[in-house]
Amino acid sequence: MDFKKTIFWAAFSMSGLMLYNNWQVHEGKPSLFGGAPASAPAVADKATTNNKVDVPTQISGAPSVAATPIINGGAIESAEKFTLQNDVLVLEISASGANVIDAKLLKSLTAENKPVELFQYTPTHKYFARSGLVSLNNNDLPNHTSTFKLVQSGKDGSGRPFAVFASERNGVRLEKTFILNPGSYVVDVGHRVTQSTSNPNPLVLYTEIVRDASQEQKIGPFGGAFSANTFTGPVAYTDKEKFNKLEFSAIDKNKITIPTLVAAGEPAWIAMVQHYFASAWIPGDKVARDIYTGRIDNGLYRIGMQTPLGMVGPGSTVVEKAKLFVGPQEERVLETIAPGFELLKDYGYLTILAKPIFWLLDNIHFYVGNWGWSIILLTILIKLVFFPLSAASYKSMARMKEVQPRLVAMKEQYKGEPQKLNQAMMEMYRKEKINPLGGCLPVVIQIPVFISLYWVLLSSVETRGAPWILWIHDLSVPDPYYILPVIMAVSMFVQTKLNPTPPDPIQAKVMMYMPIVFSVMFFFFPAGLVLYWVVNNLLSIAQQWQINQMFGKKPAK
């Protein structure tokens, strides 16, 4: 029995320790297992001009993307800015490069009840989208540093807000068209290129997302430990290689291995992700494209994609369409945008379990309309699924409790004779048909489910700002009054009392104080996760009490 209890608490302790370690890392603190979080490079207060070419040619016969100035002597700050808005998104587009330098998400609010500002261009934080042209013949073409003019704006025939910006250099005119769809975080972006010179130009369109490596602002509605991100940085998706996370630290060390060449017709996109939110370019897939990433001066990082436009002859016009996503990682929405786009939502290493758990939780919420009650119903369903295993476990524990006096007597009888004691215990287990390890299997099986649910609640923007009842106004952050952790501590204490008392005094004390230790740790977990654990404990107590009553009437032989 001692061995069984040791395995039980070792498994439970390890799962709790892993979750606490995740919280430490998320908060930017050193991991319990060594290794401090990488510090973010400082972002210069004032950007400088850099004309260095730092992205090599990767598409055969295509020009490289020049790392033209990230800004042009403060041009973005001083340039005229234009606003484009629908019912969920407000974009700010700078005349310098026609870059999208600000994006406010009207349906996602901060602690100050203001819209989350995902894209920003400030002295302390830079995160924006840009695009432009390069050519083998002439790099001085309309790019992300050129001055663009607003040539048309308003609403199209479908009532969609739009704006058209244009710039011309060396006989090449680039028009960028931005169209917002109602209720959508996806921006339709068109690049129309017209060649007026007598010499044909092999042109390449590049689309990039640029940001610094600083952690995103604490944008949970009520702050808290779990406002921190799961992963912040560039990601790339191709149909062949699937989803690739690119750490800022790996980019610094040139240790990035991503599929650079994307075949024609193969779905691919590039993005920047952070906790709850993401931005992405989804170019067309008619031709082969090239993915690249790197660090730019001033502590800025970029990920981009080159799309060859071919040889553009005199008087010719080429139009290349793309989509720019700027918004929350709502799984139902992400699935409709592009192949593999739902992978932007990070479930960690247990995605295979977390995705169906979220699917079930989301469908329950569809009918219930409250995420707190949805978590409770999900807990009941999970408990029903594991009921046969749990019943077997509790029966085994109840039988162990029955023979507890006999085990104590055996320890006295065979004191100093461990071999005879083990033989006597095994013989008793055989006669009573007791498996001393029978209570461990359900615990071991449920640990991955518990960790998967942890990632579901941590990663799901759907629960961000979602209330339950009374004092719980946001299930994604810790309980502000610690009521749920206290209830959980009491429930764990009751559970230990329903279990057989370990004969070892030290082990008995460990089991007595374990609920307190874990409850303190759960003070920092999202209220939704603690709610799941509380309900699970209460159901377990009811089930175990019933089984104890059933077997308590049967005396041990």
From Swiss-Prot:
Bilayer-spanning residue ranges: 371-391, 437-457, 515-535
Keywords, comma-separated and alphabetical: Cell inner membrane, Cell membrane, Chaperone, Membrane, Protein transport, Transmembrane, Transmembrane helix, Transport
GO biological process, one term: protein transport
Entry's Gene Ontology cellular component terms: plasma membrane
Metal-binding found in the keyword field: no
Molecular function in Gene Ontology: membrane insertase activity
Major localization class: membrane
The keyword Nucleotide-binding is annotated on this UniProt entry: no
One family name in Pfam for this protein: 60KD_IMP
Subcellular location: Cell inner membrane
Record membrane topology: Multi-pass membrane protein
PANTHER family listed in its UniProt record: CYTOCHROME C OXIDASE ASSEMBLY PROTEIN COX18, MITOCHONDRIAL, OXA1
UniProt family annotation: Belongs to the OXA1/ALB3/YidC family. Type 1 subfamily.
Subunit and interaction comment: Interacts with the Sec translocase complex via SecD. Specifically interacts with transmembrane segments of nascent integral membrane proteins during membrane integration.
Function: Required for the insertion and/or proper folding and/or complex formation of integral membrane proteins into the membrane. Involved in integration of membrane proteins that insert both dependently and independently of the Sec translocase complex, as well as at least some lipoproteins. Aids folding of multispanning membrane proteins.
Name recorded for this polypeptide: Membrane protein insertase YidC
Organism the protein comes from: Polynucleobacter necessarius subsp. necessarius (strain STIR1)
Gene, per the UniProt record: yidC
